[in-house]
Amino acid sequence: MSSETISVSKLMNRKVQTDFEDQNIMSACNIMHANDIGSVIIVTRNEDRTPVGIITERDIVRVLGKLNPDLLNTPLKTLMSSPLITLEESASMTDASKLMNIKKIRRLVVVDRNNKMTGILTQNDIFRAIDKNPNLFSEFYGESFSSKFKEIYEKYNQYRLENLMPEFNKYRLED
């Protein structure tokens, strides 16, 4: 299995949290807090609820950093990151990762062929996929890095066994 064959639709979260572009930052903060997430997709109030932007934790920090109380009531449309960067759900994990790196973003809105939002893909989704499939690690980070990492990890485990475990065993309660 390679990152070229893993489609974005397999990794993305289909439960996208949204808010309307005329809402304020407190509304978006409440959604993020209630759902333990780092972003909210901003949509229009029309029937299609068209995604038009994204509010992220960084955007909120930027607003709060200005210490201007009026910004708390400013419509999200004014504060959101736009234009929204999207990727078709048939794209590969590699495509998604490259686009995130090029655009210097951590989240992508996933759309179908009709440009309708179907989910959201985050860097964490990609990291989870790599974690579940060790072969992807070397694909993303290079074979030499992977072998060096493995070597370091094995040495660390050996060090733990030789140095830390005997020390730990001194304090172990006898049965």
Identify the function of each model-found stretch.
Residues 1-14, 56-88, 92-102, 113, ...:
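Tandem CBS (Bateman) regulatory domains
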Residues 15-18, 50-51, 86, 116:
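Short, flexible active-site loop motifs that bind/organize anionic cofactors or intermediates
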Residues 18-37, 42-44, 87-104, 111, ...:
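The conserved cystathionine-beta-synthase
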Residues 32-35, 40-59, 100, 108-124:
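A glycine-centered beta-loop-beta connector
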